[in-house]
């Protein structure tokens, strides 16, 4: 049996990792970004922690903040229009799964305009081109969308959830900075942490699991058990936040390659 394992080209992890952003953009020879985030993260200042780094480096960007929880086909289409209007050559995704999924949809459609209707991306769409470069900075420790090959978009016209699986959508770079997670409320910290735990358990027992994915998932389960209570009760504690940030990341690396179970459909 042949097993496939797809990862980001480059990942950075650790407190303050967002400060690597100018180096990343220069290495990839990028010149302007569309920052994909949501109004909530703009309001609480989490997105600003990233855009401040861009400002200090003199890197140009526009912001697309119309992202909603459970992003829709309309969100993606609006984002594609915003990307084209901005003259950007990359996307910086800041947020949880909704921001990441929207960014993936935008990046894939821009690179593969024959899928401009978005709905034809459902399932394993035969896209030919890699997404425009996405640099993903998660603000939750749950979905692991910064390293997965799948994303979920709501088709509002047909009232259905579209699961899209495409190796071409994986972000070029993941920057996992636990400091971006400190403002996450207790309830969301717990909920996203349980999502990460579910990913790890499902990824361990799925039929596609193998020795390499098992190493990731078992370690993720152990780290979540140790660190989620700390992150919930002491949101400013770097031990809990860093532990959860890494646990959800390695859980996603594995499940993205071996699949999940009935809990995630």
Pin down the residues of each PLM region:
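C-terminal catalytic subdomain
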Residues: 258-265
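Short glycine-rich or small-residue beta-strand-to-loop segments that form or flank ligand, phosphate
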Residues: 33-38, 62-65, 91-94, 135, ...
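N-terminal amphipathic/basic leader segments beginning at the initiator methionine
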Residues: 1-28
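N-terminal small/polar loop signature for handling phosphorylated ligands or for N-terminal nucleophile
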Residues: 42-115, 229-241
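Glycine-rich phosphate/diphosphate-binding loops that line cofactor/substrate pockets in enzymes
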Residues: 19-34, 52-57, 85
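Carboxylate- and glycine-rich phosphate/diphosphate-binding segment that chelates Mg2+/Mn2+
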Residues: 150-258
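Glycine/threonine-rich beta-strand-loop-alpha-helix active-site module
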Residues: 74-176
């Amino acid at each position: 049996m042949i097993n496939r394992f797809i990862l980001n080209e480059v990942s950075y992890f650790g407190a303050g990792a967002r400060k690597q952003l100018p180096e990343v953009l220069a290495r990839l020879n990028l010149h302007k970004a569309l920052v994909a985030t949501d109004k909530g993260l703009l309001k609480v200042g989490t997105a600003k922690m990233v855009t401040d780094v861009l400002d200090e480096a003199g890197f140009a960007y526009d912001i697309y903040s119309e992202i909603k929880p459970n992003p829709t086909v309309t969100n993606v289409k609006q984002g594609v229009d915003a990307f084209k209007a901005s003259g950007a050559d990359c996307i910086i995704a800041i947020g949880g799964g909704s921001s990441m999924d929207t960014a993936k949809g935008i990046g894939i459609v821009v690179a593969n305009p024959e899928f401009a209707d978005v709905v034809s991306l459902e399932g394993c769409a035969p896209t030919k081109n890699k997404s425009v470069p996405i640099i993903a900075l998660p603000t939750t420790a749950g979905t692991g969308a910064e390293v997965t090959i799948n994303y979920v978009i709501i088709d509002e016209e047909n009232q259905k959830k579209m699961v899209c699986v495409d190796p071409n959508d994986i972000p070029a770079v993941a920057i996992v900075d636990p400091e971006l997670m400190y403002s996450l409320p207790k309830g969301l910290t717990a909920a996203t942490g349980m999502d990460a735990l579910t990913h790890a358990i499902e990824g361990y027992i799925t039929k596609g699991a193998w020795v390499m994915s098992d190493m990731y998932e078992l370690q993720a389960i152990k780290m979540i058990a140790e660190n989620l209570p700390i992150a919930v009760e002491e949101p400013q504690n770097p031990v809990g936040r860093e532990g959860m940030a890494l646990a959800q990341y390695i859980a996603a690396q594995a499940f993205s390659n071996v699949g999940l179970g009935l809990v995630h459909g």
